[in-house]
Amino acid sequence: MSIVTKSIVNADAEARYLSPGELDRIKSFVLSGQRRLRIAQILTDNRERIVKQGGQQLFQKRPDVVSPGGNAYGEEMTATCLRDLDYYLRLVTYGIVAGDVTPIEEIGLVGVKEMYNSLGTPISGVAEGVKCMKSVACSLLAGEDSAEAGFYFDYTLGAMQ
């Protein structure tokens, strides 16, 4: 739930107007909107690079994934793995734009561990791929922008633990 929605819900539950502190937090959130949109745009514009390089890093760190018997062995399965990484990058951009983890949670993380377990895919490999993408993505950003994006990658990784 965004800070705007959360503040309104809390104030309404208490039948009161928004407090000066709540209004200041909302103002700060609104003012940071341009920065969040810029970060999401950079990640979106570089999505192919982030996914490709993140995948390459994953396959170097975890050669078992692309070896015979591995979950990303063969051209088709490698493409499926990269498709999944792209999906998690997209979720991260949703969180950045919203300034909140709710879209990540509600759209893509509910049941993620169970899904991969049912497919026989080790969640640790998926998480490692997301970590690798975080490294690539954050290298494209500086300072606060990198920290902002990193937060949403870390949230996604936390749900995979």
Curated annotation (Swiss-Prot):
Residue numbers of N4-methylasparagine PTMs: N71
Signal peptide feature range: none
Known function: Light-harvesting photosynthetic tetrapyrrole chromophore-protein from the phycobiliprotein complex.
InterPro entries: Globin-like_sf, Phycobilisome_asu/bsu, Phycobilisome_asu/bsu_sf
Membrane topology, from the record: Peripheral membrane protein
The species this protein was found in: Pyropia yezoensis (Susabi-nori)
GO CC terms of this entry: chloroplast thylakoid membrane; phycobilisome
Protein name: Allophycocyanin alpha chain
Localization in the cell: Plastid, Chloroplast thylakoid membrane
